[in-house]
Amino acid sequence: MPKESTYTATLPDADGIYAYTAEEDAIWSELFQRQMTLLEGKACDEYFDGVARLGLSADRVPQLGDVDRRLAAATGFGVEGVPALIAPSRFFQLLSEGKFPLATFIRRREHIDYIEEPDIFHEVFGHCPLLTNPSYARFVRRFGENAVALGKDYSWHLFRIFWFTVEFGLIDTPAGRRCYGAGIVSSPNETRAAMESGQCEFRPFDLMTVLRTPYRIDIVQPIYYVIDSFAELDAINDEDIGARIREAKALGDFPPAFAAKAS
């Protein structure tokens, strides 16, 4: 996560309504239409089903209350508006309660192609559709419960699991490999890199391998992990994650597949 934000949260009024400007609605519309076109034949069916169930459209930035109600009807999950950056402990606590934390601001036009921190487009368009899928929603909630139980000493490696699944995961389907991670489906550069470029590495998902794989948040990903089903994700929570993390620490990290970030 970035250490500080140049954005401030959009706050709701007394009725819980978030007021977005015409320019902010236009940015949402441009992002939505571009990604929906680009994702055809690239994102998994469960993702598109979720977009439909949430009633997302290019018309305007969606209201969190509408997203929350539709998610609750689908899987009992919900959302909670938060500042751009929150502590890992708060993040995992919300997941454990079945609430996905959402940044409420939308990127400015100068950041329309790439923003390092999560905005409402990444959060709602990227994360929320799959939370209408019961197996996936169960995985996310149980993952939060495990993270809360394990505590801050395990956060670094827990975020690696989150990064290579929830953010940048791929899934094999009868129709071929498809993307589901929010960092892919909400980004044109990541979508093209993962699904068109042929310049990245695809690995079968293996928990120990993931736990030993470093990542950078500010580059197109060089490595993606591929699952066979969303049930495979939920099975992660049946493992002794704490013991696996301790084992990964003892074994050490794999060499990074990227250059060190310039200081």
What does each model-found stretch correspond to?
Residues 1-131, 210, 222-263:
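The feature captures two recurrent sequence modes
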Residues 110-114, 120-232:
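A contiguous, surface-oriented mixed alpha/beta subdomain in the mid-to-C-terminal portion of proteins
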